[in-house]
Swiss-Prot record:
Keywords: Hydrolase, Metal-binding, Nucleotide metabolism, Zinc. This is Adenine deaminase. Signal peptide: none annotated. Catalyzes the hydrolytic deamination of adenine to hypoxanthine. Plays an important role in the purine salvage pathway and in nitrogen catabolism. Its EC number is 3.5.4.2. The record marks H218 as: Important for catalytic activity. It comes from Pseudomonas putida (strain W619). Coiled coil: none annotated. GO terms for molecular function: adenine deaminase activity; zinc ion binding. The lineage of its organism: Bacteria, Pseudomonadati, Pseudomonadota, Gammaproteobacteria, Pseudomonadales.
Amino acid sequence: MYEWLNALPKAELHLHLEGSLEPELLFALAERNKIALPWNDVEALRSAYAFNNLQEFLDLYYQGADVLRSEQDFYDLTWAYLQRCKSQNVIHTEPFFDPQTHTDRGIPFEVVLNGINQALKDGREQLGISSGLILSFLRHLSEEEAQKTLDQALPFRDAFIAVGLDSSEKGHPPSKFQRVFDRARSEGFEAVAHAGEEGPPEYIWEALDLLKIKRIDHGVRAIEDERLMQRIIDEQIPLTVCPLSNTKLCVFDHMSQHNILDMLERGVKVTVNSDDPAYFGGYVTENFHALHTHLGMTEDQARRLAQNSLDARLV
């Protein structure tokens, strides 16, 4: 079944480029940039990938991102991910990047963007993988800082297809960023947002009504609100669900408890994605395979999930 799932044409719509930084590349970039790491070797770093919640993961995620310094570093990060896409027949990807993770460390916005964009361009030309980049604001930072990031992005307007919202969800509702998203949409950006992962269904309502998003990233807690579920079904609003991430971060205690197939059968436009694959133990195919192994996902369900991902593209 793994080989069949791997060969299935699919799109990935929920992937953080910084979260695809594999330990081997992290160590190579640390050596290139002469950065001392708190782990002795790759295996020690892998063993640190034991999280009890989103915040514990994010602490390690931001620490790992510190090795990314130059355009070449961001190119290498993105190119490694695209090669993985090619090996798993991901024919289209819409990755996130978090400029504030890097600009707050003194890395110029254009250094980050140039490295990523050159890799995406090469991916289109050399690998045949179409793509669109999403600029994501960090919700644990202030609205003012998000506005500054949008200011930095506007000269490069054509480099992005959308703005997004990620990082620590609890205590940071979408409404905090309503004015930023209003402005981004007035500049021609589409909008997506993480909502309903650790946060309540109310955050999904806010993302839909205040941020006016086209896609819900995660959204698994929508199932707790019947009226919300009906709206998502009626309007066919896509959900970019990340099964391995959800179990690794204890959104669900075990994959056998995941609700993605329940939502699929109710008519929700759910998709399968890897989120931060270097940290969560699998890329898109591994996420599909986990659904087959633990939930008995059928070939028909897999085809529908893959088709949903292709249908839910912004570009």
